[in-house]
């Protein structure tokens, strides 16, 4: 049995989960927030109870030291020697990484080089990796990439209709994201269906504040809604999803904003927040719609219609689907959104059961037994996928 830590480092945060492997038992989990500020927050779960501490955590190295100290202080591990491996979520692996990989100096340099493709995320991921290297230099560490799962997409899916040299020189293409989540839920769907993954055509709907749809055929991603960046695809909490690119210079001309300012609006002030004017949270928006708010209704209609575009397109690409999967915050917990997405899809063999659909955050089939297309709610577990890859690649006993 080995203890493995799964790490997700943000620019001012560090999310962690400690597993006993291969049993996949969660020993503890927690979050360090507001790193670099005087009122940093350290939260850890010990024996089912959350412990919260507000203190000064100036950087990720201090956060890592504090985390490891808490593990020994609380008896979660007797000594740090029990930690057999560390798994780091890395947002962008470009074309270089089609699978998770053991971190070497060369790999770390490659991840840093890819930072121009994910300037908000990769630098923070690198900081997290280096912070653990300082404290646990001899423990195997593995990088698990959000983009890796989608590296099986064919050229017809990943190329943009731009001068081909842009792809050759600058790597401009669709990469796709949420890959670890899409991989987990499609593998789990095959288990629940009792069929080999290789025989299945699946639609994976990862619906959270960030959202993406993936077409997975034979266990391989053949297309996905996010693109060169996580800004593309369906309407999201604060992100616009796909728009006419000519809108960017038009908005600049009309508002006097710079390119960076317009892109910031598309990332942080658009989507459901932009359409409603008051919230990116679908729970708030659904409540407002029930009160008769027109913009809430329109925003929800837009959200669902954009998802339908991908369901229709990907069903055609795969010549039919065996199952539709709902995951992530909204997909797992919003029966209303699932119902609206599924309504009217009888033409493609989708028959959902409103009673069975009344589930929140748990695995469930929500289709009628006679439905040719199965509909499954599967809570995602990116952390366990990270831990599995550490076990697979780290030569851990």
Curated annotation (Swiss-Prot):
Reaction catalysed by this enzyme: acetate + ATP = acetyl phosphate + ADP
GO cellular component, one term: cytoplasm
Keyword Nucleotide-binding assigned: yes
Site, Transition state stabilizer: residue positions: 178, 239
PROSITE patterns, A to Z: ACETATE_KINASE_1, ACETATE_KINASE_2
UniProt keyword list: ATP-binding, Cytoplasm, Kinase, Magnesium, Metal-binding, Nucleotide-binding, Transferase
The protein's Enzyme Commission number: 2.7.2.1
Cofactor stoichiometry and binding remark: Mg(2+). Can also accept Mn(2+).
Pfam family, one: Acetate_kinase
Catalytic residues in the record: 146 (proton donor/acceptor)
Residues engaged in binding substrate: 89
Subcellular location field: Cytoplasm
InterPro entries: Ac/propionate_kinase (IPR004372), Aliphatic_acid_kin_short-chain (IPR000890), Aliphatic_acid_kinase_CS (IPR023865), ATPase_NBD (IPR043129)
Residues the entry annotates as binding ATP: 15, 206-210, 281-283, 329-333
Pathway: Metabolic intermediate biosynthesis; acetyl-CoA biosynthesis; acetyl-CoA from acetate: step 1/2
Necessary cofactors: Mg(2+); Mn(2+)
Swiss-Prot/TrEMBL GO biological process terms: acetate metabolic process; acetyl-CoA biosynthetic process
Residues where Mg(2+) binds: 8, 382
GO MF annotation: an example: magnesium ion binding
Function: Catalyzes the formation of acetyl phosphate from acetate and ATP. Can also catalyze the reverse reaction.
Assembly: Homodimer.
Protein family: Belongs to the acetokinase family.
Protein name (record): Acetate kinase
This protein's encoding gene: ackA
């Amino acid at each position: 049995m080995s203890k493995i830590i799964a790490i997700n480092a943000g620019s001012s945060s560090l999310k962690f989960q400690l597993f006993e492997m291969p049993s996949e038992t969660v020993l503890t989990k927690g979050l360090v927030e507001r790193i670099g500020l005087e009122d940093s927050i350290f939260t850890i779960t010990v024996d089912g109870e959350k412990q919260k501490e507000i203190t000064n955590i100036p950087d990720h190295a201090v956060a890592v030291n504090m985390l490891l100290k808490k593990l020994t202080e609380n008896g979660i591990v007797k000594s740090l020697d029990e930690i057999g491996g560390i798994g780091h979520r890395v947002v962008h692996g470009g074309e270089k990484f089609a699978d998770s990989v053991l971190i070497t100096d060369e790999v770390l340099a490659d991840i840093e080089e890819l930072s121009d493709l994910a300037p908000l995320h990769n630098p923070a991921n690198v900081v997290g990796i280096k912070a653990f290297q300082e404290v646990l230099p001899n423990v195997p560490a593995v990088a698990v990439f959000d983009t890796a799962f989608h590296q099986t997409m064919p050229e017809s899916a990943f190329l943009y209709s731009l001068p081909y040299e842009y792809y050759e020189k600058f790597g401009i293409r669709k990469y796709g994201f949420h890959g670890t989540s899409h991989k987990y839920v499609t593998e789990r769907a095959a288990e629940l269906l009792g069929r080999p993954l290789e025989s299945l055509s699946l639609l994976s709907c990862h619906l959270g504040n960030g959202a993406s749809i993936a077409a997975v055929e034979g266990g391989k991603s053949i297309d996905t809604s996010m693109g060169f960046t996580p800004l593309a695809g369906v309407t999201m909490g604060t992100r616009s999803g796909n728009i006419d690119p000519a809108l960017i210079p038009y908005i600049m001309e009309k508002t006097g904003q710079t390119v960076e300012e317009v892109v910031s609006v598309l990332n942080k002030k658009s989507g459901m927040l932009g359409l409603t004017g008051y919230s990116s949270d679908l729970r708030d928006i659904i409540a407002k719609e029930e009160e008769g708010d027109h913009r809430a209704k329109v925003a929800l209609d837009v959200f669902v219609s954009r998802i339908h575009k991908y369901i229709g397109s990907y069903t055609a690409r795969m010549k039919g689907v065996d199952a539709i999967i709902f995951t992530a915050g909204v997909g797992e917990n919003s029966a209303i959104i699932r119902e609206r997405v599924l309504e009217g899809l009888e033409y493609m063999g989708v028959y959902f059961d409103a009673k069975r659909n009344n589930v929140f955050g748990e695995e469930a089939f929500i289709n009628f037994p006679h439905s040719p297309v199965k509909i499954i709610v599967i809570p995602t577990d990116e952390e366990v996928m990270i831990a599995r890859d550490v076990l697979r690649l780290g030569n851990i006993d």
